[in-house]
Structures are given as structure tokens and as C-alpha cells.
Amino acid sequence: MSPNELTYLAILLGSAPLGFLFKNGSPQVKQRGSAAVGVALTLITCHIHSLHSAITILGTWLIIKILPRSCHFPTLGWTFTYLLFFRTITYFDIPAPTPFTNAVQLLLTLKLVSLANEVQDFYRAKKQEVTSFSKPSAISTIPSIPSLREMFYYSYCYIGLMTGPFYRYKTYYDWLHQIDPASIPSWKPLVSRLKPAPVFGVLFLIASQYFPLDYVKTDEFYEQAFLYRLFYMVPTFFIFRMRFYVAWIFAECGCISAAFGAYPVSAKSRSGGGPTVEYAPLERNAEGAKVELEYDYETIKNIDCYGADFCVKVKDGMRYWNMSVQWWLAQYIYKNSPVKSLVFGSAWTMLVSAYWHGIHPGYYMSFLTIPLCLAAEGSMEAGLRRHVSDSGKMIFDWVHWFLKMRAYDYMCMGFVLLTFTDTYRYWQSIYFSVHVLAISLFLLGRVLALKSPRRPRNTKEEKAEAKQENRLQE
């Protein structure tokens, strides 16, 4: 492991026990203490480059002060423009920021854009309250506009500061003002969530020794047989997954120990977004005694390891990976896509996601392969799967799962190789196999759809899939 990876690991390992110290604290202790820890971590790891995050916060605060009722898109433009300056800073003879500064800046960008949207929603709710004489739902609306100091507290809260998960200001506010946090379980959920992490960590260390990424950049690698080159992307993506599985599980444990993002199960919370229905934070029975509620941590869940590995479709794989960020992308980017189409909307979203990750060409080459895979999936679903028997659907789904994993293996190479030259060289050495296969399957699906008899639209299965699609995008 590199020194930076060891530093990340130390931060993650320290966040879990630290959470227990803050769990039962007063709102002031939680607010100021968590921010103090976050500021200390930022200064220690980012040094003078900590100014980048401070400037971004100040700029966002000014936008909210000047344009409180329409601050979402200006904030999106401001934070993403600053990201471009941040990534190209060396061209201005300014020292390059540390990797930790980049991590802070990435998460901060998401939080500030979300905060601006929450401010807009606050004013919209107030207007609705005045015009309709009805009180709007409070489950997702912030109670007041945060001051500059409160914005700094939220932005530098040590929870999720560098590794995620992303969370909204309302989630943070609810944590500060939790009712009876001592009754919210932390230890058992933490142990349960932590169980697979050691296995993933050992697998990561072992696989990294036998399949180093740097080997792909050598001439010797390209002298190997085609099948070996093709196979190498499988362990590369495996190593990539194990590393992030460990990091995100530990990051979630840091939230769980502090009871951060804990809501009653009845709230039907979603990763990133929080509760989706009205819920009672405290319930009493007929005798007036407090009813013990069942809680979950879905709001801060950032990875579904089983879902990511064993879901059938490429589009489902995205939902199970970096889940809080996927919610942010769906909520603030996909829904505002200039073209209302799954493929074009996904392409727009993936372009923004690539830009958010960085300016390395490998990001764009990888992310912009996803819409092609989605188009192939949709084409084969329409042209073949819906016309076969139940046993045929099962076979189709197993083949689909295998190809989905190979598609992610292929795209991962661009994500880790980063440069255009290295990514293109590797993809060329395996004859752009996934691109060729995706285009072929897209065309095949179209041909099969033309030859197959038309089925009545809106069958029960299609309605169920559409309902699930809408639910996941809300």
C-alpha cells in the first residue's frame, strides 16, 4: 500500500471510535466538535491547499446570499468551474494540491450544490405555505437558511470528509438534533457492516501482489498472449472493487458509530437522499410509554457489495456502486438532462461524472462507454429477452450478468490507467472487444425486434420495471 493509502486507512480506522464520542453529544458539541476534527484533518493533510475548500465555501455563501431563490444552477456552475481551475492549477505556476485536497474538494462540491438546492426548496416551501395555507412536508426541507458559520461546520464535518458518503444538509441537521440518540443502535449495526471488510482487505492485498497495475504499462505485457491480456482486466477490476469495498465500509462504520444518518425504518430512507415518507422520531403507546423504534442506516449506505457484483444489468450496477453519489447525480444532473432519454440522459450524466472525477482522459473514455452498454442492454431486452420463455429469460440473465461484469472490467482499465495513451493501448490490444460487442448486440437487438411480432405494451412485467425505474430516480 502507498503512503497515501495508509493515511486514508488511518483516517477511516480512527473515524469509527471517534463517532462513539460524538453520538450522545449536544447539538453544539456535535456541530463544533465534528467540524474541529474535520478542519484539523484538512490542515494536516492539505496544508496551504486547504484554502481551496474555504474559497469554494465563501463563493457558494455569496451566491446563496445574492440569489437565494435561484441559487442551485449558479452554485453548480461556480463549484464545477472552480474544479476546472483546481485541476489545472499548475498551469498558473501554483503548486499542485495534495490527493487529500482533491478528495475534500470532490465531496465539498457535492455538498454545496445540494445545499443550494435545499435552500431553493426552503423558499419554495415557504411560498407554498403562504399561498396554500398548508404546511409543507418537513422530511426533506431544511428548517432555516444556514449562516456562513453553519455552512463551514457542515462542510468540514469530519464524517465523510474525504471518502464519503455524501449527505445532504438536512441529514446533517437531523443528526445534530437527534431525539434520544442513546436509544439508536450503533454497535450491532457497526459489527454487522464491518464483517466482510477483513476478507475484502486480504483479497485486495493478495491480488495486488500477483496482478500489479504498473505491469499493464510495460512493453513486456503486450508481448503476452491475447487471452492473457484479455483476462488481466478481470483481476484489475477485482482489486479495484476490493479496495473501494473496504474504504466505503469503513466510511459507513464511521457514520454508524456516531448514529449519523440513522432514521426509523418507517421513514423508508434512500442512500444520499434520506427519508422519503413522513415518520415519527418518537412514538408512545396508549399508556404513554416510549415505543422502541427500529432504525436503519440506508441514508449513508454507499456500497451494496452483493448487488454490485451480482446484479444483472450495467444500469443496476451503477446504482449499487458509490450509492450516495449516484443519488446526487440522478437528482441534480440526470433529472436536468437537456434530452429526456435513458441513453442520452445517461451520457450527459456520465460526462458530468467524468468531469467531477477529474480531467484524465481515461475517466471520459470509461464513463462514456456506459451509454453504449445501456443502449445494447435495452436493444437486446426489447429484441430478445421479452420474447423468450421463463427458462430462456434465466439463461439470458446469466449471460447478461457475465457480459455486464466484463463490461465493467473493460471500463475499469480506463479509470485506473487514466491517460489516453495507456487506455487506448490496452483497449487496442484486446481489439476494443467490449465496444465491438456492445455495438453488435445493439444492432442484433434491433434486427430481432423488427422480426419479432409486436407484443402489447405495458405488460405487468414492463409496468413493474417502469415502476422500479421511477422509484430509483426519485
Swiss-Prot record:
Lineage top rank: taxon: Eukaryota
Q: Which residues lie on this side of the membrane: Lumenal?
A: 23-33, 94-193, 261-427
Transmembrane region positions?
A: 6-22, 34-57, 74-93, 194-211, 231-260, 428-448
Query: Which residues are tagged as glycosylated in the record?
Result: 322
A GO molecular function term, named singly, is: lysophospholipid acyltransferase activity
- Which reaction(s) does the protein catalyse, per the Swiss-Prot or TrEMBL entry? a 1-acyl-sn-glycero-3-phospho-(1D-myo-inositol) + (5Z,8Z,11Z,14Z)-eicosatetraenoyl-CoA = a 1-acyl-2-(5Z,8Z,11Z,14Z-eicosatetraenoyl)-sn-glycero-3-phospho-(1D-myo-inositol) + CoA; (5Z,8Z,11Z,14Z)-eicosatetraenoyl-CoA + 1-hexadecanoyl-sn-glycero-3-phosphocholine = 1-hexadecanoyl-2-(5Z,8Z,11Z,14Z-eicosatetraenoyl)-sn-glycero-3-phosphocholine + CoA; a 1-acyl-sn-glycero-3-phospho-(1D-myo-inositol) + an acyl-CoA = a 1,2-diacyl-sn-glycero-3-phospho-(1D-myo-inositol) + CoA; 1-octadecanoyl-sn-glycero-3-phospho-(1D-myo-inositol) + (5Z,8Z,11Z,14Z)-eicosatetraenoyl-CoA = 1-octadecanoyl-2-(5Z,8Z,11Z,14Z-eicosatetraenoyl)-sn-glycero-3-phospho-(1D-myo-inositol) + CoA
Query: What's one Pfam family the UniProt record gives for this protein?
Result: MBOAT
Q: In which pathway does it act?
A: Lipid metabolism; phospholipid metabolism
| Compartments reported by the entry | Endoplasmic reticulum membrane
Identify the residue ranges that face the Cytoplasmic compartment according to the record: 1-5, 58-73, 212-230, 449-473
Query: What's its membrane topology?
Result: Multi-pass membrane protein
Q: What class of enzyme is it?
A: transferase
Under InterPro entries, the record lists: LPLAT_7/PORCN-like, MBOAT_fam
Q: A cellular component term (GO) from this record?
A: mitochondria-associated endoplasmic reticulum membrane contact site
Q: Give the principal location in a single coarse category.
A: endoplasmic reticulum
Keywords recorded for this protein, A-Z: Acyltransferase, Endoplasmic reticulum, Glycoprotein, Lipid biosynthesis, Lipid metabolism, Membrane, Phospholipid biosynthesis, Phospholipid metabolism, Transferase, Transmembrane, Transmembrane helix
Q: Known EC number(s)?
A: 2.3.1.-
GO process annotations (BP): lipid modification; phosphatidylcholine acyl-chain remodeling; phosphatidylinositol acyl-chain remodeling; phosphatidylinositol biosynthetic process; regulation of triglyceride metabolic process
Q: PANTHER family recorded for this chain?
A: LYSOPHOSPHOLIPID ACYLTRANSFERASE 7 (PTHR13906:SF16), PORCUPINE (PTHR13906)
Sum up the protein's function in the record's words: Acyltransferase which catalyzes the transfer of an acyl group from an acyl-CoA to a lysophosphatidylinositol (1-acylglycerophosphatidylinositol or LPI) leading to the production of a phosphatidylinositol (1,2-diacyl-sn-glycero-3-phosphoinositol or PI) and participates in the reacylation step of the phospholipid remodeling pathway also known as the Lands cycle. Prefers arachidonoyl-CoA as the acyl donor, thus contributing to the regulation of free levels arachidonic acid in cell.
Q: Which family does it belong to?
A: Belongs to the membrane-bound acyltransferase family.
Which protein are we looking at? Membrane-bound acylglycerophosphatidylinositol O-acyltransferase mboat7
Q: What organism does the UniProt record list as the source?
A: Xenopus laevis (African clawed frog)
